UniProtKB/Swiss-Prot annotation:
It comes from Buchnera aphidicola subsp. Baizongia pistaciae (strain Bp). GO terms for cellular component: cytosol; oxoglutarate dehydrogenase complex. PANTHER family: DIHYDROLIPOYLLYSINE-RESIDUE SUCCINYLTRANSFERASE COMPONENT OF 2-OXOGLUTARATE DEHYDROGENASE COMPLEX, MITOCHONDRIAL (PTHR43416:SF5), DIHYDROLIPOYLLYSINE-RESIDUE SUCCINYLTRANSFERASE COMPONENT OF 2-OXOGLUTARATE DEHYDROGENASE COMPLEX, MITOCHONDRIAL-RELATED (PTHR43416). E2 component of the 2-oxoglutarate dehydrogenase (OGDH) complex which catalyzes the second step in the conversion of 2-oxoglutarate to succinyl-CoA and CO(2). Residues 112-150 form the Peripheral subunit-binding (PSBD) domain. GO terms for biological process: L-lysine catabolic process to acetyl-CoA via saccharopine; tricarboxylic acid cycle. This is Dihydrolipoyllysine-residue succinyltransferase component of 2-oxoglutarate dehydrogenase complex. Gene3D superfamilies: 2.40.50.100, Chloramphenicol acetyltransferase-like domain (3.30.559.10), E3-binding domain (4.10.320.10). Belongs to the 2-oxoacid dehydrogenase family. It catalyses: N(6)-[(R)-dihydrolipoyl]-L-lysyl-[protein] + succinyl-CoA = N(6)-[(R)-S(8)-succinyldihydrolipoyl]-L-lysyl-[protein] + CoA. The keyword Acyltransferase applies. Residues 3-81 form the Lipoyl-binding domain.
Length: 410
C-alpha cells in the first residue's frame, strides 16, 4: 500500500493562492484516477483537482474555506491492491460509523432548544431556564413548558393570564420571523471584484461621455440575413459581433484608447484584445476575445456564446480571462437604459451598451419613431482627453448606423 499526496497545482503567475470551496469526496471514499476530488477558487476562476491515482481518500488536510498555496499538500490518497481493498473499505467505514455514533452521543448530551423555545426565552429575558422542568423527549423544554412557567410567575404576582392570551401570544410574535438576517462569506471572485472596483474609483480620473445611436440599420441587417447566417454558421447573429467590429475600427482611429498607463509610461497596444463583460452565478467576469480584429462575426458570436456557457458552469480558464485592452459591457440584456460603467484596470476605457427602445427622433425635420440606444464611454482622463473620447464614441455611432462603412473601410 502506498500513500500518495494530493497537491495544489502550479497557479498562473498573477495568482498567488487559492481557497478550498468543495470536496467532492469524503474520507474513506473509493476513487478512480482523474475523478474530481476538490474544487479550489482563485481570484479569477474555479479549478478542479483530479485524483492522481486509483485508491481510497485517506485524509483531508485542508478543509473547505482554507487558503492554500501552490505545491501545498491538501490531502492523501491510499493506493492499495485489490485483495486489501475490501478490508480497507470496511475498516474505514467502521471508523466513520464510530465517529458518527460518537458525534450523535455528544449531541444528545448537549442542552438544545427548539427555535420556538429560544424565541420565548429571548422575548421574556428568561435567565433561569435551568430551573424549568422539561416535559419533552429526553426532558427537553417545550413551548408549553415555557408558557406554563410564565403563567405561574404571573399568577404569583397576581397578573392573570388566560389560555386565549397564551395562544394568541404565539401568533402575535410570528412577525419576528421576518426580521432575520443572513451572513454569507464573500467568494474570492466577489472580493476581487470589490477590490478592483474600489481601486478604479481611487486610482483613475474616471469620466463618462454619452451619445445615442439609431439601431435601425443593424436591426434591418439581422432581420434580412439572420436566418441565412444561422444556417451557414450554426449560431444566431447577435448584436455583440456588430459592437465588437465597430469598437475595433474606432480603436484603430484612436490609439490613445487602446492604451494603458504603467507608472510614468504609456503602453500602446498594436493588437486588439477585447474583454466582454459576462454575468455568471459567481459574479461579473470579463473573458477576452484575443486578436478580435482577425475574427469573423461568426467566430465572435461563437466565442462569446462559449464564454457564456463556461461562465454559467464555472469552467472559464485563466487563459480565457487574462489580458484585454478594452471592455464592452452590455447592460441592455438586463433592460438597462442608461449607466456609467466602471473602467476595468489596467485598461483605460470601457464601452457600455444599453437596451434598444423605440423613441421619437427628428429625421430631415420630420418626427419619426426609431429603435434608439444610448452609448456610454467611461475613460481615464489622465490618458484620454475629451476630444478623443467624444470622437471615439461618434465613430462607433457612425459605424453602427451605417455598417457598410466598416466593409468599405471608410
Amino acid at each position: 500500500m502506498n500513500i500518495i499526496n494530493i497537491f495544489i497545482p502550479d497557479l498562473p503567475e498573477s495568482v498567488t493562492d487559492a481557497t478550498i470551496i468543495k470536496w467532492h469526496k469524503k474520507k474513506g471514499d473509493k476513487v478512480q484516477e482523474d475523478t474530481i476530488l476538490v474544487d479550489i477558487e482563485t481570484d479569477k476562476v474555479i479549478l478542479e483537482i483530479p485524483s492522481p491515482s486509483d485508491g481510497i481518500l485517506n485524509s483531508i488536510i485542508a478543509d473547505k474555506g482554507k487558503i492554500v498555496l501552490p505545491g501545498q499538500v491538501i490531502g492523501t490518497l491510499l493506493k492499495i491492491g485489490i485483495k486489501n481493498e475490501e478490508k480497507i473499505i470496511k475498516t474505514t467505514n467502521n471508523v466513520v460509523n464510530t465517529d458518527n455514533n460518537q458525534n450523535i452521543n455528544l449531541k444528545l448530551l448537549e442542552k438544545t432548544y427548539s427555535p420556538t423555545v429560544r424565541r420565548l426565552i429571548s422575548m421574556h429575558d428568561l435567565r433561569d431556564v435551568d430551573i424549568i422542568q422539561g416535559t419533552g423527549t429526553k426532558n427537553r423544554l417545550t413551548r408549553k413548558d415555557i408558557l406554563n412557567y410564565l403563567k405561574n410567575i404571573r399568577s404569583n404576582t397576581n397578573k392573570k393570564i388566560n389560555n386565549y392570551d397564551l395562544n394568541a401570544y404565539n401568533f402575535n410574535t410570528t412577525h419576528k420571523n421576518h426580521r432575520s438576517i443572513k451572513r454569507v462569506k464573500m467568494t474570492r471572485l466577489r472580493k476581487k471584484i470589490s477590490e478592483r472596483l474600489l481601486s478604479t474609483k481611487n486610482n483613475t480620473a474616471s469620466l463618462t461621455t454619452f451619445n445615442e445611436v439609431n439601431m435601425q440599420s443593424i436591426l434591418n441587417l439581422r432581420r434580412k440575413y439572420g436566418e441565412l447566417f444561422k444556417q451557414k454558421h450554426g449560431i444566431k447573429l447577435g448584436l455583440m459581433s456588430f459592437y465588437v467590429k465597430a469598437v475595433i475600427e474606432a480603436l484603430k482611429i484612436f490609439p490613445e484608447i487602446n492604451a494603458s498607463i504603467d507608472n510614468d509610461e504609456i503602453i500602446y497596444y498594436n493588437y486588439f484584445d477585447i474583454s466582454i463583460a459576462i454575468s455568471t452565478p459567481r459574479g461579473l467576469v470579463t473573458p477576452v476575445l484575443k486578436n478580435a480584429d482577425l475574427m469573423s462575426m461568426a467566430e465572435i458570436e461563437i466565442k462569446i456564446k462559449d464564454f457564456s456557457e463556461k461562465g454559467k458552469n464555472s469552467k472559464l480558464t485563466i487563459d480565457d480571462l487574462i489580458g484585454g485592452n478594452f471592455t464592452i459591457t452590455n447592460g441592455g440584456v438586463f433592460g438597462s437604459l442608461f449607466s456609467t460603467p466602471l473602467i476595468n484596470p489596467p485598461q483605460s476605457a470601457i464601452l457600455g451598451m444599453h437596451a434598444i427602445h423605440k423613441r421619437p427622433v427628428i429625421v430631415d425635420e420630420n418626427i419619426e419613431v426609431h429603435p434608439m440606444m444610448y452609448l456610454a464611454l467611461s475613460y481615464d482622463h489622465r490618458l484620454i482627453d475629451g476630444k478623443e473620447s467624444v470622437g471615439f464614441l461618434l465613430k462607433i455611432k457612425e459605424f453602427l448606423e451605417d455598417f457598410s462603412r466598416i466593409v468599405l473601410n471608410i
